[in-house]
């Protein structure tokens, strides 16, 4: 599969220390427009920094790439206001002869940005010109260029990043407020014996004069000044700001400019990860530079023409909880090239060594991530058709992403298209889809309910002891799986909502996402986060809930610090 030799990659995690870390560390879980390639070495530098500059500390994350780890802030967008000078947020090593390698902190002159995800740029440092991924840069001297600014990420995603046990107290980020347009939020990690590792959220308000404040007695002309101040003084916060929240390089939008239908010879299959009825999955390398996952389909599995048409739709689906489709080999045998997820399928992960250490908070969080990806599919009026743990992929930090969306519709195998053959996933399929072929987002909701049983049972096959024909008959008669062992009733109630006979009575994925993200949330700031219905929670379940988050308002410094009730 191609003779090109892979360049060794050493991706770095973005961890910065604004000041020496707190000793308390809590463990736990005129530019030429002709692109020319610069021969930059594949290394990472670690410059010293103060606020507004850039630094990085090398750290391997998953062994290959970091696209499957945590959500990276979405900073760059279309050029506005005539801005053409950008700063690099990450190192980037060129993948093709027309790419431009650059280092974090490098200033780049954008020649044009009409190419969408890949812009033609001229490095003011090296003098080289080439294409760059637009989401790796931000306008110079802008708030987007600050490493602590994470832009439009959700409260829940900020908590997922900050609750990494490796983060010391005071690890922080600044994000857009979800509830107040034009406002920001400072999210800070904290620790105490009552709640364990938790996150506090402080609303940053804007002055009419253009300044910012958390408490009105201490005002700042810029967010940079605010962050610099609270890095030295807690002054009512739960802790002074210590480290910028670590994150990783984002995925590029595609492998390179114009790299969609690629030659088979550009791929090297290296490690077989698994196989199924219709093909195999490999870890491999594209163009000798880029780690990818490659799904190979057996000839005859689906029409190449139909697949290519569907793939054009699939590549437009972009969400942090969907596995990114990078490229295709459209002649048989069809190859589907996606981002590589280091931990493999959720099903294998649950049944493997790591599965035994997963507790309810982690399982619910994984379910919430899947629901988030499917809520996006729902908004885009798309249907997955084969939602189950085997089609969810896991990366570092328990990041989960939905894979293989839409492919089931294209399979031409008779044992599959009959919908009752051995290859068809009857146990995950809604009755109206299995019996009449009515696949909708609501049949995906049914499948999500089955997936919840896979999570709570660590990968057990649904409907244990029953064959496919029996499952179909019993479900039509009203049978639903009972509550799995050690699963709270409130979660089983959610499963049963997903399994309502009338598809229109099933919840939306938007609802499922909100329910699961708030599953351990309490309205009182001092309470450990419990289930939506705490009365249905057992003592054993309560003992597992050791993480929480609050929105807090800083008060004037006093002998005893007081945190008000969370903001809505």
UniProtKB/Swiss-Prot annotation:
Classification via Pfam families: PK_Tyr_Ser-Thr, SH2, SH3_1
Residues with PTM Phosphotyrosine: 416
InterPro entries: Kinase-like_dom_sf, Non-receptor_tyrosine_kinases, Prot_kinase_dom, Protein_kinase_ATP_BS, Ser-Thr/Tyr_kinase_cat_dom, SH2, SH2_dom_sf, SH3-like_dom_sf
EC number: 2.7.10.2
Gene3D superfamilies hit by this protein: Phosphorylase Kinase, domain 1, SH2 domain, SH3 Domains, Transferase(Phosphotransferase) domain 1
Keyword terms, alphabetized: ATP-binding, Kinase, Lipoprotein, Myristate, Nucleotide-binding, Oncogene, Phosphoprotein, SH2 domain, SH3 domain, Transferase, Tyrosine-protein kinase
Annotated region (Disordered), positions in chain: 1-58
Residue ranges of domain Protein kinase in the record: 267-520
GO molecular-function term, one example from the UniProt record: ATP binding
Biased composition (Basic and acidic residues): 7-25
Reported modifications of this chain: The phosphorylated form is termed pp60v-src.
Catalytic activity annotation: L-tyrosyl-[protein] + ATP = O-phospho-L-tyrosyl-[protein] + ADP + H(+)
Lipidation (N-myristoyl glycine): 2
Domain SH3: 81-142
Active site (record annotation): 386
Binding site for ATP: 273-281, 295
Segments forming domain SH2: 148-245
Family that this chain belongs to: Belongs to the protein kinase superfamily. Tyr protein kinase family. SRC subfamily.
Entry protein name: Tyrosine-protein kinase transforming protein Src
Organism listed in the record: Avian sarcoma virus (strain S1)
Gene: V-SRC
